[in-house]
C-alpha cells in the first residue's frame, strides 16, 4: 500500500481503525475531521463496522463516491481485528474503486510529538503484560519495526 499525496488528502477520506477492541472511524478532508465515531465494541467489530461506516459518512453529509479513498490502520494490534478492517477496506476498493492506504498506527501516534530535535518512542498495550514498542527519529521515521516486549525491556531499550 502506497501513501497518498498531500494534494490527494484534500479530498474526503474514510479512516478505519480496527487494530484493537475499539472501532474508530472518521471522515476527514483537507486536514479537518468532518465526522467521527469511536466505541469499544470488543467481539462485535465485524457486525458493527459496516453500519457505523455508513453512519459516519451520513454525519459528514457524504456518500461513497465522494471519497478520495480509505486510510487504514495496519497495526500493530489484534490480528483478527486488523483483518476485519482490512477486509472491509479491500471490499470498498474492489466494489467502488476507492484507493486503500495503509497507515502505521505507531507512527501516527508519534507524529504529533516529532520535530523537537529528539527521538520519540511509542508504547501500546499488547497481550497480557506485554507492550508494543517502536522508536522514531525527530521526523517520525521509524528506527526499526514495532516489537512486542515486557515494559522493563522496553524502558531499558528506549532512547
Region annotations inferred by a language model:
Residues 3-9, 32, 44, 99-159:
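Surface "functional belts" at beta-alpha junctions
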Residues 69-100:
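DPxDG-like acidic metal-binding loop motif
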Residues 48-51, 87, 91, 108:
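Short amphipathic alpha-helical face segments that pack within enzyme cores
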Residues 13-15, 71-73, 81, 119-123:
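Short glycine-aspartate micro-motif
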Residues 60-65, 94-103, 118:
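Phosphate-handling active-site elements
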Residues 2-72:
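N-terminal beta-alpha supersecondary unit
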Residues 21, 75-76, 127-129:
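Short glycine-rich anion-binding loops that position phosphate/pyrophosphate groups of nucleotides
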Amino acid at each position: 500500500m502506497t501513501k497518498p499525496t498531500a494534494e490527494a488528502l484534500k479530498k474526503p477520506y474514510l479512516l478505519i481503525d480496527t487494530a484493537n477492541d475499539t472501532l474508530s472511524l472518521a471522515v476527514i478532508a483537507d486536514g479537518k475531521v468532518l465526522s467521527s465515531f469511536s466505541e469499544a465494541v470488543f467481539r462485535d467489530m465485524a457486525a458493527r463496522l459496516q453500519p457505523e461506516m455508513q453512519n459516519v459518512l451520513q454525519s459528514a453529509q457524504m456518500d461513497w463516491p465522494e471519497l478520495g479513498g480509505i486510510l487504514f490502520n495496519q497495526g500493530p494490534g489484534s490480528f483478527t481485528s486488523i483483518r476485519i478492517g482490512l477486509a472491509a477496506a479491500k471490499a470498498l476498493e474492489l466494489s467502488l474503486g476507492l484507493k486503500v492506504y495503509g497507515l502505521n498506527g505507531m507512527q501516527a501516534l508519534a507524529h504529533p510529538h516529532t520535530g523537537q530535535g529528539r527521538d520519540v518512542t511509542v508504547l501500546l498495550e499488547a497481550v497480557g503484560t506485554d507492550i508494543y514498542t517502536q522508536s522514531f527519529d525527530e521526523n517520525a521515521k521509524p528506527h526499526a519495526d514495532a516489537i512486542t516486549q515486557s515494559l522493563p525491556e522496553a524502558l531499558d531499550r528506549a532512547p
